[in-house]
Swiss-Prot record:
Membrane topology: Multi-pass membrane protein
Transmembrane segments: 4-24, 36-56, 67-85, 101-121
Gene Ontology annotations for the cellular component aspect, listed alphabetically: plasma membrane
Domain of life: Bacteria
Pfam families: CRCB (PF02537)
Role description: Fluoride-specific ion channel. Important for reducing fluoride concentration in the cell, thus reducing its toxicity.
Name of the protein in question: Fluoride-specific ion channel FluC
Gene that encodes it: fluC
Length: 126
């Protein structure tokens, strides 16, 4: 039960952070492209890869903290369902180039971010 509570608390924090990040992106860039979701998914991929790499390479991140951060915070922060919905909305609006750019930027951006975080954590760990 305690581990479930850790995931739930982390999820609440991650969801709140996602809302704030998306709201900021909407104010900063406008509604023409889903930059907020792109930002949370790419940065979330970077952070999750960093958390997992650090926790699996050493005991510096205890299992309960890893659960709180990875499944909880990052699970609440990133959003695959919004990515899919926003891609479909762009297609339905006839904005095929924007949909393709969003799809490519998300998939490639998330993979590059995860790879970069993994390399960074391994480099920092020596």
């Amino acid at each position: 039960m305690a581990r479930l509570l850790l995931v739930c608390l982390g999820g609440a924090l991650g969801s709140g952070a996602r809302y704030l990040t998306s709201a900021w992106a909407l104010r900063a860039f406008g509604p023409d492209f889903p930059r907020g979701t792109l930002l949370v998914n790419v940065s979330g991929s970077f952070l999750l890869a960093g958390i997992m790499t650090a926790s699996l390479q050493s005991e510096a991140v205890p299992p309960d903290l890893r659960l709180f951060l990875a499944a909880g915070v990052m699970g609440g922060f990133t959003t695959y369902s919004s990515f899919n919905y926003e891609t479909l909305a762009l297609v339905e609006q006839g904005r095929l180039a924007a949909a393709a750019a969003y799809l490519l930027a998300t998939v490639v951006g998330c993979l590059v971010a995860a790879f970069a975080a993994t390399l960074l954590v391994r480099w920092l760990a020596g």
